């Protein structure tokens, strides 16, 4: 709920009374300070609604690639994010009662407890799934595994261990247990439940020089089959580098899973552009689909593919767009009402940084005959933007996109009615001064009130977390929030 909006609309006198009382409290410092120190006291009448539901995010608490970070089910939106020690934290919001629960810690990440390295690794953010029995699953904690896990048969290792936690009771986020049933050699988890209840967990099987794989469960995630490679890493013979990939997998129509991806040229140390060695250099956009009923993979024209797909096969059969000298950062993929794929890809000019330079969100789509598009969602914009999109008929596309305007972080809707050739800004959902936003992909089965998670990045700790919808952020009582926030260990 939005308290200010509600009081203004339904009870102007109530709103004025609340405002007057707040001013009085500001003058009566001793009395009000005493009341605020007793958050559980019924005497506390100065509680207020805030736009964030938690304030303990760390590092980059959210990303589009680890998805879904939230799910709507039975009138409740369940959300997840990276909290203290890079552990997975889970909260929920009941849309009927207006009540929040949590956040609760769902597991213990090895990434936040490693020796050396940078302060936050950020690769083990939680991914969520709810099985057919109502148990909530969280996949988290890996950046490819480490040498202590043994030899990675499908790549190399780095840090952490990919883990799988499940709620102890259906639809209950308060207690969790780890299930030791997925490989520790994983990162960038993406979880998909098919209509028949089968679960597919997609991820990269290790650090940069590793295959992309999936593991399948037919018993609500209690056991998983061995990893199956679908994108192949291999050493190049023409340059000092290894073929690598970044993928985004989502549910398509019926029994199909759709996958978009970009290519990472993983340079050896001292090689590459200007001898920069290993950078995040990535290029091009690809697409293919997986029929889970037949087990067959195919390109957009229905041509069958043999797994694992190599760079040569990808270039010949699955290419959606060449990006030339632009460096890329992959986004999401969705189907329109005609079953044609659309892809979000972030691309920008290499400006010599380790990451190349800022990348802007662009839209690519298959029109039934060829891949078209590639223009920016935000015209003339040169800084960093990220967004996820909804598409109905091929011409109507809506992006919920974050960008910066001066020093402000902005999250707003951008609308196209011509298949992505032109986008126009519609309305702003969230705006914060002197900040930047990290966002999730769209919440699975989202309702208009709660569509995306947002992290307000002012520093790298104590980050405020928002659940936003068409009308802005879902609010929470500040007293309730302070009472609910856990202490990290």
Curated annotation (Swiss-Prot):
Top EC class of this enzyme:
lyase
Q: What family is it from? A: Belongs to the polysaccharide lyase 25 family.
How the protein is affected by changing residue 204 to N?
Loss of catalytic activity
Q: Where does substrate bind?
A: 60, 122, 125, 143, 204, 208, 246, 278
- This enzyme's EC code(s): 4.2.2.-
Q: Does the keyword Ribonucleoprotein apply?
A: no
Q: Which GO terms describe its molecular function?
A: lyase activity; metal ion binding
Q: Which Pfam families match?
A: BNR_4
PROSITE patterns attached here?
PROKAR_LIPOPROTEIN
Q: Which residues form a coiled coil?
A: none
- What name appears for this protein in its UniProt entry? Ulvan Lyase-PL25
List where in the cell it is found.
Answer: Cell membrane
Q: Which organism is it from?
A: Pseudoalteromonas sp. (strain PLSV)
Q: Which GO terms describe its cellular component?
A: plasma membrane
Secretion signal span: 1-31
């Amino acid at each position: 709920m939005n308290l200010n909006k509600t009081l203004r609309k339904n009870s102007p006198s109530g709103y004025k009374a609340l405002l007057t009382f707040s001013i009085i409290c500001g003058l009566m410092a001793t009395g009000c300070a005493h009341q605020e120190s007793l958050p559980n006291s019924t005497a506390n009448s100065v509680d207020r609604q805030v736009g964030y539901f938690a304030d303990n995010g760390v590092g980059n608490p959210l990303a589009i690639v680890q998805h879904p970070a939230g799910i709507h089910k039975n009138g409740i939106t369940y959300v997840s994010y990276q909290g203290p020690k890079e552990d997975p934290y889970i909260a929920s919001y009941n849309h009927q009662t207006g009540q929040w629960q949590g956040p609760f810690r769902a597991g213990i990440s090895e990434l936040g407890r490693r020796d050396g390295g940078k302060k936050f690794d950020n690769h083990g953010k939680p991914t969520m799934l709810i099985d057919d029995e109502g148990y909530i699953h969280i996949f988290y904690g890996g950046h490819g595994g480490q040498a202590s896990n043994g030899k990675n048969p499908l790549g190399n290792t780095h840090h952490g261990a990919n883990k799988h936690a499940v709620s102890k009771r259906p639809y209950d986020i308060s207690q969790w247990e780890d299930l030791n049933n997925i490989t520790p050699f994983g990162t960038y988890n993406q979880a998909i439940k098919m209509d028949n209840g089968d679960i597919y967990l997609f991820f990269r099987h290790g650090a940069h020089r590793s295959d992309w794989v999936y593991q399948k469960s037919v018993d609500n995630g209690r056991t998983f089959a061995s990893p199956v490679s679908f994108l192949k890493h291999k050493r190049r013979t023409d340059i000092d580098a290894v073929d690598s990939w970044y993928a985004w997998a989502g549910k398509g129509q019926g029994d199909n899973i759709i996958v978009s991806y970009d290519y990472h040229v993983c340079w050896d140390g001292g090689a590459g552009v200007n001898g920069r060695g290993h950078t995040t250099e990535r290029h091009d956009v690809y697409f293919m689909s997986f029929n889970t009923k037949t087990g067959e993979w195919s390109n957009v024209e229905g041509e069958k593919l043999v797994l694992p797909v190599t760079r040569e096969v990808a270039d010949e059969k699955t290419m959606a767009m060449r990006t030339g000298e632009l460096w890329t950062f992959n986004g999401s993929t969705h189907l329109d009402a005609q079953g044609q794929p659309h892809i979000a890809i972030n691309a920008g000019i290499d400006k010599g940084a380790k990451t190349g330079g800022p990348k802007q969100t662009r839209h690519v789509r298959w029109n039934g005959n060829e891949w078209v598009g590639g223009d920016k969602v935000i015209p003339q914009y040169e800084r960093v933007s990220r967004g996820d999109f909804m598409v109905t008929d091929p011409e109507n596309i809506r992006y919920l996109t974050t960008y910066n305007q001066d020093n402000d972080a902005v999250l707003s809707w951008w609308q196209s009615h011509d298949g992505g050739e032109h986008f126009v800004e519609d309305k702003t959902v969230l705006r914060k001064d002197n900040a930047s936003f990290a966002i999730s992909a769209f919440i699975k089965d989202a309702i208009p009130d709660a569509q995306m998670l947002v992290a307000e990045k002012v520093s790298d700790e104590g980050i405020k977390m928002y659940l936003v919808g068409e009308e802005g952020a879902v609010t929470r009582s500040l007293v309730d929030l302070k009472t609910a926030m856990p202490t990290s260990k």
